[in-house]
């Protein structure tokens, strides 16, 4: 009995000390302290994410330092796996993630329509209106979509600076680029499919340009990492529809990898996140969610993980302001709204895949 009481004292002391250490974020309302205290008592937050663990590492470390006593259980998976896993777990009625964070904006929003908790983050006023859907799904990043190329094997004068220029280059040098252009397999990659939809909306010549890129045979992959690796090695020469955040991070240590920001239009992806209605750790989930959107969390993403910030008040150039100064009106941010769901309707999805297969010769 004495041992049990002693254990209880230790347990309560631990919770109390963690609550004291986990201070109210600057500028937040006083009653947010209740969320902090409850989150510390919950002790854990489970994240389902497409952002790889290495990139998210500094963010996780910063959050756990901000809120001692809350452990982040981070599950890194591709967008299709995340969607299918979450749906299956909901159908089975078992435990699942507290927060979903996905680069596949359309499937993330589809999940949010059925499973997201409505939550007005204290950071809401710092975000662009197009990045928030019904205070349920929030865009968290501002990531241009780029071309990559092998700097050793493609002369600077040949580097394409538009989607049409890319197609013309491959058509004009068909022998050189035969089987050497890579992009997403839109049937295996949720992100790849979503970007193909957005390309088709942004560019009336999309399918014609895609056919030009595919003249010598298009190589398709389901992973950004694989595409960058193959372009860097010379197995492929050009990569199309690559997340600029990953490309910029790799280019810092890979002298073979070049990046081109197209001048005709640059799609901008924003990783979509939401708190789940059935969260087992709802207060810890809110703390994580707000931390990701906060100036501190966004600074970590921008300056340590090389993922551009959705905010405009982050130190350095890796935020909305910095991207706007660099790319101007070419930027086409993808809004977090119902238009993302249009091509998830089975008939429209199949129609687009059929068009893509024809153009890509797949």
Map each language-model feature to its residues.
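Immediate post-signal peptide segment of exported/extracytoplasmic ligand-binding proteins
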Residues: 22-46, 65, 175-178
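Short, hydrophobic alpha-helical packing/hinge segments within bilobed ligand-binding/sensory domains
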Residues: 35, 82-83, 107, 227-228, ...
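A ligand-binding cleft/hinge motif common to bilobed small-molecule-binding domains
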Residues: 106-111, 232, 237-256
């Amino acid at each position: 009995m004495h041992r049990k009481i002693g254990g209880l004292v230790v347990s309560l002391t631990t919770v109390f000390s963690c609550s004291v250490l986990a201070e109210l974020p600057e500028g937040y309302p006083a009653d947010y302290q209740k969320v902090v205290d409850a989150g510390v008592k919950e002790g854990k937050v489970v994240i389902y994410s497409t952002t790889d663990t290495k990139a998210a590492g500094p963010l996780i470390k910063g959050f756990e330092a901000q809120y001692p006593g809350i452990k982040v259980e981070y599950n890194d998976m591709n967008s299709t796996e995340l969607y299918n896993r979450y749906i299956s777990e909901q159908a089975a009625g078992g435990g699942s993630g507290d927060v979903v964070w996905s680069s596949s904006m359309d499937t993330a929003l589809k999940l949010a329509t059925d499973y997201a908790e409505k939550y007005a983050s204290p950071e809401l006023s710092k975000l662009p209106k197009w990045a928030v859907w019904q205070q349920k799904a929030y865009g968290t990043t501002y990531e241009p979509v780029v071309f990559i190329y092998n700097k050793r094997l493609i002369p600077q004068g040949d580097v394409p600076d538009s989607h049409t220029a890319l197609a013309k280059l491959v058509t004009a040098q068909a022998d050189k680029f035969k089987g050497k252009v890579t992009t997403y397999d839109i049937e295996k990659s949720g992100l790849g499919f979503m970007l193909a939809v957005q390309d088709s909306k942004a560019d009336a010549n999309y399918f014609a340009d895609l056919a030009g890129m595919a003249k010598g045979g298009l190589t398709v992959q389901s992973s950004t990492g694989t595409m960058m690796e193959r372009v860097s090695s010379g197995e492929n020469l050009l990569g199309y529809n690559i997340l600029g955040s990953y490309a910029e991070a790799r280019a810092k240590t890979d002298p073979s990898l070049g990046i081109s920001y197209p001048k005709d239009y640059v799609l901008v992806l924003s990783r979509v996140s939401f708190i789940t209605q059935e969260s087992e750790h709802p207060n810890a989930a809110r703390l994580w969610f707000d931390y990701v959107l906060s100036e501190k969390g966004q600074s970590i993403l921008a300056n340590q993980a090389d993922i551009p910030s959705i905010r405009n008040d982050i130190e350095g150039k890796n935020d909305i302001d910095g991207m706007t100064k660099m790319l101007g009106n070419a930027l086409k941010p993808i809004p977090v709204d119902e238009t993302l769901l249009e091509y998830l309707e089975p008939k429209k999805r199949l129609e687009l895949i059929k068009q893509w297969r024809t153009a890509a010769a797949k």
